[in-house]
């Protein structure tokens, strides 16, 4: 965005539920290929190094310091069994070891991979996919939460999860991702697969 512009036109028309969203790198070469390998080719050992990159994002240190909890975008049981690990949990655990909380937000419905869908269908795909762990719901009220994901393309996963957390009483929800597509690229990129 041009200097001095804080919000794009889309955000002005439909304000996102995130207080802020920080990204370490652009989701182009070589990051797209590296992230695909991290996520799909069983390279969980890369998580500490990728989290270190995320910590270097502008405002990341302040955002993590201010957070009460750092919450990874959860995978469905089916996707977790298929992949063997949740890449967002690995990143969150290394970003904020004392604040990472993988049991607060649940994926209660398996959905087709976001990367297989056009932008317009991504939000509908995730409707009802996330919920707060019922016994933990009181712990959300008044909390400043940070969602963690590896890639943000359309923002559907992060926005849907943020809305669930805000409806449960979170004071604010921000997000930190490793990579973000450029504005207007959401329909061409096929990378958000949580």
Predicted regions mapped to residue ranges:
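Glycine-rich phosphate/pyrophosphate-handling loop used in enzymes and phosphotransfer proteins
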Residues: 1-194
């Amino acid at each position: 965005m041009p200097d001095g512009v804080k919000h794009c036109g889309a955000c002005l028309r439909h304000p996102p539920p995130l207080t802020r969203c920080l990204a370490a790198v652009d989701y182009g070469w070589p990051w797209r290929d590296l992230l695909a390998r991290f996520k799909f080719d069983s390279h969980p050992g890369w998580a500490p190094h990728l989290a270190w990159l995320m910590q270097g994002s502008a405002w990341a240190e302040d955002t993590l310091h201010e957070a009460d909890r750092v919450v990874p975008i959860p995978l469905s049981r089916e996707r977790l069994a298929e992949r063997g690990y949740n890449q967002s949990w690995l990143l969150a655990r290394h970003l904020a070891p004392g604040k990472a909380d993988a049991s607060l937000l649940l994926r209660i419905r398996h959905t087709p991979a976001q990367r297989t869908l056009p932008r317009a269908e991504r939000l509908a795909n995730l409707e009802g996919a996330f919920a707060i762990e019922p016994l933990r719901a009181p712990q959300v009220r008044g909390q400043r939460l940070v969602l963690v994901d590896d890639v943000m393309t359309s923002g559907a996963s992060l926005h849907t999860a943020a809305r669930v957390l805000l409806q449960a009483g979170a004071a604010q929800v921000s997000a930190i991702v490793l990579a973000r597509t450029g504005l207007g690229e959401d329909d061409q990129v096929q990378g958000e697969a949580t």
